[in-house]
């Protein structure tokens, strides 16, 4: 099973386990809600899919790496309590609440969400003293004498023994009480995630050429060498930040993330070439509609991997513009909705309050503060993905700048105050239009170059396919259109259908002995 399918299964499980009957009771009793056990190699994305699943299901998430805990923190600390049993006073041992269970209650209190996912990572790598506690947890859904609260779905994750020497096998009794999912690395599935997460285009381009280097764990005389999906993503974040700071990544830096010597050397060499192609071909000039004549001449002699790298560089430049347009669009939409809520609030302000100095700015300040508080609450609950969080933070920043304009204007009435805000929104709307026009012009320039350089070759197929698969590109084109994209995409679909029909025809002829 790949990680995408595992995420879908987790989401379906959460919905099923939290479904209620006509009496308000859970449709599947807690005793029949089997914990999910994810087994897969390290760095494959198990923790990330838990965050995504919780966010998309609208529930809280408490995540623990159990190898960081002792028996005392997992079970609780012992203390002596006096009891009377059968007329005889005795001293008995009880336990404080488990730190993990306490964290669940703390999360419920902080977020207001009463249902969630309790995720325990590296569950089969615990110490000998903690192993019985983990078995009890999976079998009985308790830590010590404290049960996991109702409405919390248990998901655990572990590594197969070939990846971790401290792994402990679960017995059949335990395995018969869980839902085990074995997860394997899958590059095409990861690329779907990578496009949405804006993984550095050099990494995507490199893995397109060398898919075997996506995930490897090799043991030799010098120790274990490895490269994981987590390593590629973390390296991507660093490369993007380095580029924004004007810094250059070298092989020594890359080896800190790609801890496989041959792959680190290979990617480092490719990254140098990638940047060289960007400068030599003038990708920004191409997207500005000013491609250099020398670029076309060089492409005539270029090998396929160089051509593919150039296509990915063009796609990366477009992706930057599509994302900027999306952010500008989201900011304008969010502020527009807030603007009309403000107009309604202005109209409903009591007459006696409307006479006070700066009353409109004060009301706007309170509404903005409420918006910021809502954002923080959702952020604490983990209900905002990165793009949504960035959009809300940018909206709050914009609203604060509008508040300053309101204070400066000292509007005498609601109409005058709203006019100030509407003027500010006009500037925001203009910025949205500019971002959209910039992205559209770059897309047309890219098609001009691709047609002149590659016509309808394999490189054009890659270009159009990647535009189709990119969430940012797909959303932009769906909203703003692009005739040449639609035409090439239609032709590609027809070609695929013809190829599929030819394959079916050949298969039919073979069955009848005609070939």
Spans of features found by a protein language model:
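Alpha-helical lid/collar subdomain of P-loop NTPases
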Residues: 196-353
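Terminal-proximal interaction/regulatory segments of ATP-powered molecular machines
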Residues: 300-515
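AAA+ P-loop NTPase catalytic core and its hallmark functional loops
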Residues: 1-212, 217-220
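Context-gated lysine
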Residues: 4-7, 15, 20, 46, ...
């Amino acid at each position: 099973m790949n990680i995408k399918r595992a995420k879908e299964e987790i989401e379906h499980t959460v919905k099923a386990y939290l479904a209620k009957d006509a009496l308000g009771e859970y449709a599947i009793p807690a005793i029949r809600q089997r914990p999910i056990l994810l087994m897969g190699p390290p760095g494959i994305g198990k923790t990330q899919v838990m965050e995504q699943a919780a966010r998309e299901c609208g529930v809280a998430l408490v995540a623990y790496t159990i190898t960081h805990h002792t028996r005392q923190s997992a079970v609780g600390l012992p203390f002596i309590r006096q009891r009377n049993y059968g007329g005889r006073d005795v001293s008995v041992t009880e336990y404080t609440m488990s730190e993990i269970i306490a964290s669940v209650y703390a999360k419920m209190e902080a977020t207001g969400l009463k249902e969630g996912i309790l995720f325990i990572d590296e569950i089969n790598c615990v110490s000998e003293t903690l192993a019985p506690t983990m078995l009890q947890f999976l079998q009985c859904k308790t830590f010590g004498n404290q049960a996991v609260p109702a409405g919390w779905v248990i998901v655990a994750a572990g590594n197969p023994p070939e990846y971790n020497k401290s792994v402990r096998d679960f017995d059949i009794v335990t395995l018969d009480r869980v839902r085990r999912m074995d997860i394997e690395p899958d590059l095409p599935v990861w690329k779907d995630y990578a496009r949405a997460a804006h993984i550095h285009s050099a990494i995507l381009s490199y893995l397109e050429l060398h898919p075997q280097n996506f995930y490897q764990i090799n043991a030799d005389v010098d120790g274990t060498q490895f490269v994981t999906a987590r390593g590629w993503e973390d390296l991507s974040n660093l490369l993007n930040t380095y580029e924004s700071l004007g810094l250059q990544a070298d092989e020594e830096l890359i080896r800190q993330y790609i801890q496989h010597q041959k792959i680190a050397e290979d990617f480092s060499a490719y990254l140098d070439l990638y940047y060289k192609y960007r400068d030599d071909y003038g990708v920004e000039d191409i997207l500005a509609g000013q491609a250099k004549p020398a670029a076309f001449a060089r492409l005539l002699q270029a090998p396929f991997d160089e051509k593919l790298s150039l296509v990915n560089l063009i796609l990366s430049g477009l992706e930057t513009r599509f994302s900027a347009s999306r952010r500008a669009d989201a900011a304008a939409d969010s502020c527009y909705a807030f603007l009309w809520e403000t107009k309604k609030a202005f109209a409903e302000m009591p007459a006696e309050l409307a006479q006070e100095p700066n009353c409109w700015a004060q009301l706007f300040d309170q509404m903005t503060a409420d918006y910021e508080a809502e954002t923080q609450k959702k952020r604490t609950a983990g209900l905002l993905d990165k793009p949504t969080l960035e959009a809300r933070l940018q909206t709050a920043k914009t609203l604060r700048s509008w508040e300053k304009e309101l204070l400066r204007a000292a509007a005498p009435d609601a109409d005058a105050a709203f006019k100030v805000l509407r003027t500010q929104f006009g500037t925001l709307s203009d910025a949205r239009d500019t971002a959209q026009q910039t992205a559209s012009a770059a897309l047309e320039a890219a098609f001009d170059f691709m047609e002149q350089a590659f016509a309808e070759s394999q490189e054009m197929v890659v270009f159009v396919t990647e535009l189709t698969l990119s969430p940012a590109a797909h959303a932009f084109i769906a909203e703003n259109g692009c005739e040449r994209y639609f035409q090439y995409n239609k032709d590609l679909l027809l070609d695929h259908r013809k190829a599929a029909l030819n394959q079916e025809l050949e298969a039919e002829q073979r069955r009848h002995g005609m070939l």
